Regions:
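A conserved beta-strand/loop capping segment in the N-terminal third of enzymes
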Residues: 69-88, 93-133, 183-187, 336
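Residues forming the flavin
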Residues: 1-72, 117, 124-541
């Protein structure tokens, strides 16, 4: 750190929240430093879809889309309800007030935003619900990271010039000219990047990459392989951190404050099991997501809240062991999810949080579909009809009759036969009378618009039939350190721990146990990190 001023604001974590917190700190006169325990940066944010849910954002205004703070607040009140002070009126209001300003100021620093204009809120019929509140980063050339590209956390997904609103059209690319044109457009943009010697980043990777470029432009030091060991408290205030290094423990000054943005505890099985009844084995979160900030915060008296909450998500385990957090596989017509009794129990096209939560008490279930479904749609990245390899490696179970399929899967045969008969009867009328699948615009977003009369709900009639296991996974845990509307961490008695802030999945969620829209994890992580840094610098809303 030769030549660098002594840091006065320590940010823990290099996900989107931590990077934004450091940027806000520098823009408001602080001397931040970012520490990251892993040898790579980006956290779970880099592995995510990269959506940022910001009601009443500047891009909506630019596009002439009506929204307001009041509509956003009405929607949060309707979807979240009363879950205690983690989602107080003051915290909801702070999020809605500061989010649009954060978006605008990051754009001034060079961040390229775009809107997903077709993406609905997850409960679009609730008061204040809207379409198009989700933002994302534009496709970005990874080579602009310079040497930081070598240490960026990467997923197994290939680098493509994808966009959020293009994703729902990929699985139906061979069903409509519009969807096929979208696929060709994605491929064309990807090739254009490559022909210019560039590497296209999308989704979570463009989000963290663009933020890291701003961090480097502002001269903010980032230290990898530097796990937080403890917080130093002097006279009731956090004034420094102790980190672990190859040379032993080291103290880093934080005279103005510390911002914890170190993620959740999805991958600490021993810590998680008594709190949530699951170990995290079905979570695609970062392997470094082990609750360090939670434990270190508690050591200085911090209060925890909503520790049972997670961003639940039905997942499948691919033959190579990769956890696939897919969406369209369960929303396209011709597929259903059943439990071991052969029964449906949820609207499969609903929010992934709702579907995943419904699966929790049932354990692993089965996604069942017919040949027509398999011949029409992509399954993950596997094109239609290309089925043999997935049958040969055991990922798909197949049979010529439903009773035979049930026997192979350990599903109650009578239950499955009765369920499919019921589904086929309802699908012929286009109305899911049991779970209302396809009754709102969110259900239809990942549907097949060429399938009539219901783009998200169809029968299972053509043999052979198929099934694959689906598990109650999650994208991240949500519970964490209780914080107020300024992102200040609170003690059990509600008093403020001076100098300590928290945002993201190590803070108790302003969204409570629900998930209002795409980007309702990254949005609060970034906005409350922004709020924390500005408050620490003496700037208030």
């Amino acid at each position: 750190m030769a030549g660098q001023p002594e840091p006065d604001f320590v940010v823990v974590g290099t996900g989107a929240g931590g990077l934004v917190g450091a940027i806000a700190a520098r823009l408001n006169g602080l001397n931040p430093i970012i520490i990251e325990k892993a040898p790579v940066w980006g956290g779970t944010s880099a592995l995510s879809g990269g959506g940022v849910w910001i009601p009443n954002n500047p891009l909506m205004k630019r596009d002439g889309v009506e929204d307001s703070l009041e509509a956003g607040l009405a929607y949060l009140d309707a979807t979240i309800g009363d879950v205690g002070p983690a989602s107080s009126h003051e915290r909801r209001l702070a999020y809605l007030q500061e989010g649009p300003e954060m978006v605008a100021q990051l754009a001034e620093q060079g961040f390229g935003w775009r809107r997903a204009p077709r993406y609905p809120d997850y409960y679009p019929d609730y008061p204040g619900g809207r379409v198009g509140r989700t933002l994302e980063g534009v496709n970005f050339d990874a080579k602009r990271l310079g040497p930081w590209l070598n240490t960026m956390r990467r997923s197994a997904m290939p680098d493509m010039a994808l966009s959020t609103d293009a994703a729902p059209q990929i699985p139906t690319a061979f069903r409509s000219m519009k969807s096929f044109a979208t696929l060709l457009s994605v491929m064309g943009r990807t090739i254009a990047f490559r022909l210019k010697g560039q590497v296209p980043l999308a989704l979570g990777k463009t989000l963290v990459a663009q933020l890291m470029v701003i961090v480097q432009k502002l001269g903010i030091p980032v230290r990898l392989n530097t796990p937080l060991h403890s917080l130093v408290e002097e006279n009731g205030r956090i004034t420094a951190v102790v980190v672990k290094t190859a040379r032993g423990e080291e103290r880093i000054s934080a005279a103005r404050g510390v911002l914890l943005c170190a993620g959740g505890f999805a991958k600490d099985a021993a810590y998680r099991l008594p709190l949530q009844g699951v170990t995290g084995e079905w979570s695609p979160a970062s392997p470094d997501d082990t609750g360090d900030a939670h434990k270190i915060g508690v050591a200085v008296g911090a209060q925890l809240a909503l520790m049972d909450a997670a961003t639940w998500f039905p997942v499948s385990i691919m033959p190579d062991g990769v956890i696939n957090a897919g969406i369209w596989e369960r929303t396209l017509p011709g597929s259903i999810i059943v439990d071991p009794a052969g029964h449906r129990f949820v609207n499969e096209a609903a929010s992934y949080v709702d579907v995943g939560q419904a699966m929790l008490n049932r354990g692993p279930c089965w996604l069942v579909f017919d040949s027509r479904y398999r011949n029409r749609y992509f399954f993950g990245s596997t094109p239609p009809r290309m089925t043999k390899a997935l049958v040969d490696n055991g990922f798909f179970v197949t049979a010529s009759t439903l009773p035979e399929l049930a026997a192979k899967c350990g599903i109650d045969a009578d239950g499955l036969v009765q369920t499919v008969a019921r589904v086929n009867d309802m699908a012929s009328r286009g109305v899911d009378e049991d779970f209302q699948r396809g009754n709102n615009v969110y259900d239809l977003y990942y549907g097949d618009p060429t399938h009539k009369p219901n783009a998200a709900f169809g029968g299972l009639e053509q043999t052979p039939f198929f099934a694959t296991r689906v598990y109650p996974g999650d994208l991240s845990t949500k519970g964490g350190l209780m914080a107020d509307e300024h992102a200040r961490v609170l003690r059990e008695d509600g008093s403020v721990i001076d100098g300590l802030y928290a945002a993201g999945n190590c803070a108790a969620p302003v969204m409570g146990r629900t998930y209002p829209g795409a980007g309702a994890t990254l949005g609060p992580a970034m906005v409350f990190a922004w709020i924390a840094a500005r408050h620490c610098a003496g700037v208030t809303a």
